[in-house]
Amino acid sequence: MKKEEYWDIYDENKELTGRTMKRNDWNMRPGDYHLTVLGVIRHTNGRYLITKRVMTKSWAPGSWEVSGGGVMAGETSRAAVLREVREETGLDVSDFAGGYLFSYRRDNPEEKDNYFVDIYRFTGDFSESDLHLQEAETDGWKLASVDEIRALAAEGMFLHYDSIRDAFEE
């Protein structure tokens, strides 16, 4: 049986409140937030690793994205992005160049889902044999140029682009 996962609850200033919530419980009070991370992985050849969501996902099946997910209770943002990238792609980016870039905040009071997103970018050398996709999450990958990512975003097929576009700029 899988252990239940919990997220820390933050206030509007991104300070821990000392409270937690069940992962994906979507019943947050106004002014409560959880923390998520996205890891933009740049190959030394200048292209970006993007993955395609499985068609069985309830939200945005078949869309392209960068690795990411929720920060577990007691976990740091950096530890979470390293974990998510490893779980979803098999890559250990802990020794890659780069790190934290910026954060943004989303307020969704109708859905009772308010959150912060910490954006990281890591640059390193890796080969196809280093990639081991998480089958329940991803249905393919590619190394894409910024122009290819922009084109996918223009088609509505690349998630979060408007919020993270600065992570693809040098």
What are these model-predicted stretches?
Residues 23-27, 102-108:
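Short, solvent-exposed loop/turn elements at beta->coil junctions and helix N-caps
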Residues 61-62, 73, 100-104, 112-170:
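Nudix hydrolase/Nudix homology domain
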Residues 36-68:
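A glycine-rich, hydrophobic loop/mini-helix early in the fold
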